[in-house]
Amino acid sequence: MELDLSPSHLSSSPEDVCPTPGTPPETPPPPDNPPPGDVKRSQPLPIPSSRKLREEEFQATSLPSIPNPFPELCSPPSQKPILGGSSGARGLLPRDSSRLCVVKVYSEDGACRSVEVAAGATARHVCEMLVQRAHALSDENWGLVECHPYLALERGLEDHESVVEVQEAWPVGGDSRFIFRKNFAKYELFKSPPHTLFPEKMVSSCLDTPTGISHEDLIQNFLNAGSFPEIQGFLQLRGSGRGSGRKLWKRFFCFLRRSGLYYSTKGTSKDPRHLQYVADINESNVYVVTQGRKLYGIPTDFGFCVKPNKLRNGHKGLHIFCSEDEQSRTCWLSAFRLFKYGVQLYKNYQQAQSRHLRLSYLGSPPLRSVSDNTLVAMDFSGHAGRVIENPQEALSAATEEAQAWRKKTNHRLSLPTPCSGLSLSAAIHRTQPWFHGRISREESQRLIGQQGLVDGVFLVRESQRNPQGFVLSLCHLQKVKHYLILPSEDEGCLYFSMDDGQTRFTDLLQLVEFHQLNRGILPCLLRHCCARVAL
């Protein structure tokens, strides 16, 4: 083997190459050290790493090429080796998790704000960013709503969903958008009694398996253990009329199972021969239809839609259903969410609860009304204070205290005019988030419905029939009821009442604060104010 290690810049002489005269060609040179005067010291020589020996070059050209049986183990020098398993299993971040994306979010008044988020940002993270920017109170009810105005569809994003992934599935150039608003019904299935969301007649296990277990225990097992019963009931399904080209509505008996959504072609039969498959739960999303009568001709106001994920635009492929009432629709929507996400929904609820408790423990208490559920009426007229237990006495004490406070405030801050106190008391409600000004009855019902038909959601608006009156719109049992508030004047003082003057309040703020603690003539307490937040 010959190694040519001589650099080009070194000179060689014939004496260095030829052997000494008289020495046989086969004889190697003597090992004795040369004389000191003829010593030649070696120099370090650079050897390229890609240099091949002549024998290797010859073998490489003479042997046939053999395919590599493990191509996944080899990679170009400029790339890192490919490791098996997903990035989540290895504890590493996804390759594009640091990629920044722009997400546009709209408020209920139509204002838009662009937010720069990471590619893996969840809906909960985006809501927290918007709450901080809007200087709003942070709670578990904030959410993002995926809205498709062209299709009249909308749904609330779950807290764990990726906002960027949802946005990338939208059609290019469409009018789809995210809306930032409160959704009080998001976790109501873990708060309210089970029979309010899942009626006994709609849970198949209660009717088919007489095991002795109560309906409430069955629903608790459904929510806690992840055992999925069958949801069933009559729904109207939109179909095409033969030869007419019109969309007709027909009533079918439907079943929601873990495997998908079905309807029976023969009455209430559950025979597999009579079941027609509609949609896969894991490959679809359920939406609320907002303008069903106008766009789809829905016979009632309680429509919902099952939209396959692969469907990007157009009405073709949408499965439009119509229920008889709001309770039935809420049951189908809640069951669909539970079947699709399972225990992840309960984890989201627990995380939201822990975040709320942590913020209330670490930070300052949120700004709220003077009235609070922890306050009680006290009487300090004697030598020692006592708790007022009589409701009528407590009401009179609260009214007297509120009037005294307002007299002090008006005397200190207002101008010395006789009607200044009256004007301040009459306009104090305009600064409250629950006051929506002059909106119609239908608009108030729409706003409350968008933020969740939960008991205690309310707003106050100006009356359109009575120029001097107001209306309290309140949700109870998934229905919005309206209560007229009329003003009255007694001895130069203005009062407001909902019961023909039997219970009078100096302003609307006092009326709302009182009914947050006492039902009065209302069917439930005022729990959640329907408010709009500007981004």
From Swiss-Prot:
Comp. bias intervals (Pro residues): 21-37
Region: Disordered, residue numbers: 1-89
SMART domains in the record: PH, RA, SH2
Alphabetical list of InterPro entries matching this protein: BPS-dom, GRB/APBB1IP, GRB7_RA, Grb7_SH2, PH-like_dom_sf, PH_APBB1IP, PH_domain, RA_dom
Coiled-coil region list: none
Entry comment, domain topic: The PH domain mediates interaction with membranes containing phosphoinositides.
Compartments in which it is found: Cytoplasm; Cell projection; Cell junction, Focal adhesion; Cell membrane
Residues recorded with modification Phosphoserine: 364
Expressed in which tissues: Detected in liver, kidney and placenta, and at lower levels in lung.
Record PTM Phosphotyrosine, positions in chain: 187, 341
Domain called SH2: residue spans: 434-530
UniProt-recorded name of the protein: Growth factor receptor-bound protein 7
A GO biological process held by the record: stress granule assembly
GO CC list: cell projection; cytoplasmic stress granule; cytosol; focal adhesion; plasma membrane
Family affiliation: Belongs to the GRB7/10/14 family.
Residue span, Ras-associating domain: 99-185
Top-rank taxon, per record: Eukaryota
Organism: Rattus norvegicus
GO molecular function: identical protein binding; phosphatidylinositol binding; protein kinase binding; RNA binding
One Pfam family from the record: SH2
